[in-house]
């Protein structure tokens, strides 16, 4: 409940929070989404097993992913599979050259963003993920070696957490969060970050 209040204060109306509170909310928002959504799915799967049928797994420790592609293999698997099978592959997937592959990724993730909501903020969220995947493909194409696994996990988590900013109520609210963090002069009480560190240590 405590962290729900912190997150609601940052992701709701224009935030009037310390830098520590905003940072804690940014780093925890996706974890709260994951535990809530995955928890409901796990209960549904358990109920299904009790009734004699098996529902597919929809989350597979997404925050253990060491790159963004792996994150999407683990996060909301039913949605990512649908996007792959019915949008990305019909567009040509990776079969029509590197440039077309990049365009297909951007289109697929733009539509993924729109699936989550009709606002411009959700479109930007989808395009951020698509652009990041294109960037990673470009790095791989020129022979850049992957990061150390622990650093890769950290960077993936930070990027995903940053992108969740655009799940705020609207694009102006998302901009307000970014602006409030940039303008914050007082870091504030670090107790939120201390508790957050314990939570993240348990997850990772």
Which positions does each model-derived feature cover?
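Membrane-embedded transmembrane alpha-helical bundles that form the catalytic cores
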Residues: 1-202
């Amino acid at each position: 409940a405590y962290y729900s209040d912190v997150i609601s204060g940052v992701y709701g109306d224009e935030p009037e929070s310390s830098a520590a509170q905003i940072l804690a909310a940014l780093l925890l928002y996706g974890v709260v989404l994951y535990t809530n959504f995955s928890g409901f799915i796990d209960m549904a799967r358990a109920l299904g097993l009790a009734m004699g049928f098996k529902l597919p797994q929809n989350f597979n420790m997404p925050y253990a992913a060491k790159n963004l592609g792996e994150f999407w293999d683990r996060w909301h698997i039913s949605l990512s599979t649908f996007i792959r099978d019915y949008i990305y592959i019909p567009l040509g997937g990776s079969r029509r050259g590197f440039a077309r592959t990049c365009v297909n990724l951007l289109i697929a993730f733009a539509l993924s963003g729109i699936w989550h909501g009709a606002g411009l903020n959700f479109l930007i969220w989808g395009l951020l993920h698509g652009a990041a995947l294109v960037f990673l493909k470009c790095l791989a194409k020129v022979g850049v070696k992957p990061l150390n696994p622990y650093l890769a996990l950290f960077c993936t988590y930070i990027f995903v957490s940053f992108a969740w900013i655009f799940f705020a109520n609207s694009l102006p609210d998302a901009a307000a969060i970014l602006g409030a963090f940039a303008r914050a002069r007082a870091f504030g009480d670090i107790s939120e970050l201390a508790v957050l560190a314990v939570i993240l240590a348990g997850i990772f």
